[in-house]
From Swiss-Prot:
The gene is sfsA. This is Sugar fermentation stimulation protein homolog. CDD domains: SfsA-like_bacterial. It comes from Rippkaea orientalis (strain PCC 8801 / RF-1). Belongs to the SfsA family. One of its GO terms (molecular function) is DNA binding. Transmembrane segments: none annotated. InterPro entries: SfsA, SfsA_C, SfsA_N. PANTHER family: SUGAR FERMENTATION STIMULATION PROTEIN A.
Amino acid sequence: MTSNLIYPYPTLIPGVLRQRYKRFFADIELASGEIITAHCPNTGPMTGVCTIGSPVYISPSDNPKRKLAYTWEMIQVNNTWVGINTAIPNKVIKYALENQWFAQLKERYTTVRSEVPYGKDNKSRVDFLLTQNEGKSPIYVEVKNTTLCQGEIALFPDTVTSRGQKHLRELMALLPDTKPIMLYFINRGDCYSFAPGDEFDPTYGTLLREAVKKGLEVLPCRFEVTPEGIHYLGLAEFLTKL
């Protein structure tokens, strides 16, 4: 590949964040002075990245049935664009897996399936299941969007996540017969290392370290976000302790 551009954005509209409320709504002031309400595709607290008055970009929709005509895509934090649309990481990773972008996974799979049931009574779904020739162990890949940064270190989670804890326990249950991977999608280009967010969810941090000791593979993937698109930058250093 000659370019590390992995996901081009459609034409985006600049604005300024004026308010985020009820989790799903964001008031954005456009260059004209008009204030519009955009869909906020991130239900989390967005710790450290939701600062009123910050520059943002939104995408327009041509779907007349949509209640909100715009989607909030990114926000600028300390001169770095941070992707906040949680629907994007899985799209990017699916493309990357299908096109063998990750050197760490080369020749380890031939097929990619999304949202595959697994876990106790098949009541959970893993983001991606990678398989190859019969007799080879499948690879389970769970993706976590990561936006919080402290001193060039990306942290996940940014709040208590019982769902994230559940995913770690389910991936650990697959060991040692299969090879699970936790892929952290670092949705900003200013982080060079990754660590569990113990300050925000110490239980998650404990579980992650336990899972790694048992064989869980961690891929903290760095991405640069720009209004033109998302670029893959390679892996961040995984820090088990800060």
